[in-house]
């Protein structure tokens, strides 16, 4: 609970709000949104794609790290990458593909200094303690990620009305 309280305190700050505003700008300037993630992050990508579509910004999700490369038809495509570690090789490989077709990239990650964050035009970090079970299963809270998605979508909804 303490780590969630710390995140929500951070979410009230100027830096976080600037990140949300920049994400909204990238979304409204794009023609197409792709949400990408693997594992738990893939579930967050799917949730985000549905929520963006629900508020009028058509989006698809990719949770298959071997999905084919985007084509030149992806003009003004926005890729939103979800990754707790920010170091998942397959997600990094996908970011390289999207960077190759001049897509804007937003990352939502727990590590603002990660490879994925450095490859992104905008990173929205959430700084929550990682919880890894002995058999290497990540059970870190995804509450901050859901909050970020919903915060962006509420702002998009407000702008449309």
Name each region found by the language model.
Residues 28-160:
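Glycine-rich phosphate-binding loops that contact phosphosugars or nucleotide phosphates
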Residues 1-19:
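HTH-adjacent hinge/linker in prokaryotic transcriptional regulators
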Residues 2-5, 21-24, 146, 150:
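Amphipathic alpha-helical segments that line or abut small-molecule/effector binding pockets
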Residues 18-30:
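Glycine-rich phosphate/diphosphate-binding loops that line cofactor/substrate pockets in enzymes
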């Amino acid at each position: 609970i303490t780590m969630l309280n710390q995140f929500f305190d951070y979410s009230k700050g100027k830096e976080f709000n600037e990140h949300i505003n920049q994400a909204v700008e990238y979304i409204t300037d794009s023609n197409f949104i792709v949400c990408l993630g693997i594992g738990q992050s893939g579930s967050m990508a799917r949730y985000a794609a549905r929520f963006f579509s629900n508020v009028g910004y058509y989006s698809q999700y990719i949770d298959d790290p071997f999905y084919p490369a985007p084509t030149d038809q992806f003009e003004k495509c926005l890729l939103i990458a979800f990754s707790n570690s920010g170091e998942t090789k397959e997600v990094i490989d996908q970011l390289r593909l999207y960077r190759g077709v001049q897509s804007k990239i937003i990352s939502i990650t727990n590590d603002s200094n990660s490879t994925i964050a450095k490859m992104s035009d905008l990173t929205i970090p959430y700084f929550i303690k990682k919880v890894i079970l002995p058999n290497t299963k990540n059970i870190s809270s995804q509450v901050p990620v859901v909050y970020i998605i919903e915060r962006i979508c509420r702002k998009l909804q407000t702008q449309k009305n």
